[in-house]
Amino acid sequence: SQKKYGYFTSEKEDYNRIIETLGLKGKTRHPLTFLLEAADDIAYSVSDIEDGHKLGIITLDRIKRTFSTHDCPGELVGLKKYESNMDLYVRLLRIKCQSKMLIKTTKEYNRRINEIIEGDFDSEILKVSEASKLRDVFKELSVYNFSNIKVLKCELLGQEVLSYLLNTFYNAL
């Protein structure tokens, strides 16, 4: 919780009014922010596998090795018959893992709801849930995407285009 963004001094009155209206204590985060944070992490970390596959960065072998390294090979059960169609394989794997992660994270949230409401819970709900191993798998797989030259070139090009557009618009004012 402490690493999350706060508010500007100029917003202090608004912040205090929100805290009072929601019945939160001091620096306690709203309980739903824990679920929102987890859902965001699950959605983006797992979707990276599809992007990596489409770019030819993440292969079936890499997927199997990474799941095995993190002691999660059971997640691949039932998908073997789709190995000849990697687009479908990766899509089904994403759906299966996202569903499992959402269920396990929600279960952990419900288990810790009193700590969360009281402001005694100061961690990411996904990290402490039974879904943390799967999260680690997808975080490791995403590293291959972000260190790949194709991805880096695309990001650099995007940055150049945005800089050009912003400079053009700024100078037009």
Regions found by a protein language model. Give the residues of each.
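Histidine-centered, transition-metal-coordinating active-site segments
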Residues: 1-173
